[in-house]
Amino acid sequence: MRDESRLDKYVIKEILRINRHLPRRRKTLEELLREERPHVVNRDGTKHYFDRDELERLADILPRYLHGRLKLPILIELGYSGAAVIRGKAEVRVVCEVLGEEWRFSQDRVELNMLDVRKLRREFPTATQYMFSTEYIMGRPKVERRG
């Protein structure tokens, strides 16, 4: 049991290291549209710049009252299951619109297959980023080992 816990901690630490490219703080679409050179600062100190055309397309997709709620970049969580997850009401609404899927007001999470992820990334390469998730480690059921 101890070795398993130590391994989990090591894997989580490595995943966090891999995620250094993610922003320290995501900005809203509203904030980014006001910037001359829209960007966020990443955890590793580099800057991630957004394509203004992508931001304007996102602004066209979402009602204006949600511009202050859509946090960018949209994070595509990749985990153990093979599916990708998008979280956040405004983020999910955008993704559903782009993919032609039905969106429900209460929906704040959507799972995507890799074909959908590819389509989303192709349409919004600077407004989306991959994030490697530790959820599968912390959420997996513990298996008791015998002998």
UniProtKB/Swiss-Prot annotation:
InterPro entries, alphabetized: UPF0216
Lineage, uppermost ranks: Archaea, Methanobacteriati, Methanobacteriota, Methanomada group, Methanopyri
Signal sequence residues: none
The protein's name: UPF0216 protein MK1676
Organism: Methanopyrus kandleri (strain AV19 / DSM 6324 / JCM 9639 / NBRC 100938)
Pfam families xref list: DUF61
Family: Belongs to the UPF0216 family.
NCBIfam families registered for this protein in UniProt: PRK04115.1 (NF003153)
